[in-house]
Amino acid sequence: MTIAAPQENTVAVVANAAALKVGVPKEVFAGEQRVAATPETAKKLQKLGFEVLVETQAGAGASFTDSAYEAAGCTIITDSVSLWEAADVVLKVRSPQHHPHLDRHEATLLRPDQTLVSFIWPAQNPELLDQLAGQGGTVLAMDSVPRISRAQKLDALSSMANIGGYRAVIEAAHHFGRCFTGQITAAGKMPPAKVMVIGVGVAGLAAIGAAKSLGAIVKAFDTRLVVKEQVQSLGAEFLELHFEEDGSGEGGYAKVMSPAFIAAEMALFAQQAKDVDIIITTALIPGKKAPLLITQEMVESMKPGSVVVDLAAEQGGNCEVTQPGTVTVSYTH
């Protein structure tokens, strides 16, 4: 098996091969609504010389019908096995999963002469890598695309993070018991919600912007001091530790900090948890489990009705009480 981050000229290289078939299977991960190609992007693939195969109902969760794909020139395939057998290149959102209807793992469908393009999270999924290696083939890990200008068009991770940050605020607003913006009524005043965002990457910046647009008071923290101006430009307060250490790592991502720094930031989070209404965590470190930043004790110290949204849940979670894919209601005073 060959596994690598896609380079800038990847599409141009494969597009020169005539009649290659690109397959888009239906995602089988529980609750996943996304699809790897829309009818519009399928048209673009066809213009590059690809034939596009789409599993029936693959786009249903994203409101794309089979007829919409057919109108775009795609061929609808009735089942996953037939699609994998026919495709030269398979496009997925999620990494290969155990298929509930086939009672087998999707990785077993990969052929030695086939290419899989999807999120893989190689460092977090060593068993999956071993399984894919046993199948042969080429795997392009979209989550491993470097954050450089040359690869910007391939940066699906940042695209999803931007949407995730926005959605985190919408979810928080849905579960929060009050308005985000302050209100003055005949019955009295209602203060604006206080939001703390931990991790000011693409998702964090999107969350800050969305929360500010709804009228909340927003604070943000990141180990990388270079993001301070970005936070302030969005009208939020940057929570800063007076510590001679910077968290900027390779490729613009955060790095692992010293024990002393971690202790200082945990003390800051414990203090802020008692004051804010909503905490949104987005902190990730490439190739490692998500750092634990919000402890159970901090959650218990928050005000009744407070909300924590953990965007790092699937990578281990930034919050100790996180249960991926679920809403946990607990710790009432």
Predicted regions and their residues:
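ADP-ribose/adenylate-binding Rossmann-like module
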Residues: 111-128, 138, 279-327
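Glycine-rich phosphate/diphosphate-binding loop of Rossmann-like nucleotide-binding domains
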Residues: 25-26, 31-59, 183-272
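A structured beta-alpha segment of the ubiquitous adenosine-cofactor-binding alpha/beta core
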Residues: 74-88, 96, 248-279, 283-300
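Generic hydrophobic/aromatic pocket-lining and core-packing "Φ" positions
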Residues: 42, 66, 129, 169, ...
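Glycine/threonine-rich flexible loop motifs
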Residues: 31-36, 98-107, 285-293, 319-320
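Conserved small/polar residues in nucleotide/adenosyl-binding loops
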Residues: 331-333
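Glycine/serine-rich phosphate-binding loop and adjoining beta1-alpha1 elements at the start
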Residues: 2-21, 27, 96-98, 102-194
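N-terminal beta-loop-helix "entrance" segment that forms/cooperates
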Residues: 55-75
